[in-house]
Amino acid sequence: MKRWKALYYTTTAFSMLVGLWHFFVPTMFQWYDYLPMQYENLVVGIDYTNSCFSALLCGGSLLLLLWGKRAFTDNKESKELYFFYTIIWLLRAALATWIEPWPLEPVAWAAYLQLIMSDLLAVCMLAMSLKFITMMKNKSN
């Protein structure tokens, strides 16, 4: 069980760190250099979307970290939130795998790193979710 708990905390912590990191992505990768500034509404919309996504990813993952002990007991809600985040990461991994995450130039390493890490996190979260499903079935028997 220690390995499963380690996997749970690792995946939720990593998800939270991605949420925190995403707050700084527009500046780190100079998003605004690629956008025509005459479309200020577009820039504001992208900023709002990124900020809300980052806050939801970071906040939800923080909740999962705080509810870690509950997830390994009979608390169904914490498992359901974990399942929801698993679906999000599976969708993200599918997008990164089958659709180019962004043009590879000028920062190809970032696109490849996103592909590898989102696929790895999705697989790990899927494994943890399957373990939770097994635990829930065993409790009901």
Protein language model features and the residues they cover:
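Cytosolic juxtamembrane helix and N-cap/initiation of the first transmembrane helix
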Residues: 1-18
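Membrane-interfacial loop-to-transmembrane alpha-helix junctions, especially the N-terminal start
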Residues: 8, 75-84
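Core segments of alpha-helical transmembrane spans in multipass integral membrane proteins
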Residues: 17-19, 26, 41-69, 83-91
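Membrane-interface helix-loop junction between the first two transmembrane segments
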Residues: 24-36
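Juxtamembrane helix-break-helix junctions at the cytosolic face
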Residues: 61-79, 100-103
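Individual transmembrane alpha-helices with interfacial aromatic-anchor signatures
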Residues: 87, 107-121
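Membrane-helix boundary connector in multi-pass membrane proteins
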Residues: 94-112
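Membrane-water interface at the C-terminal end of transmembrane alpha helices
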Residues: 118-139
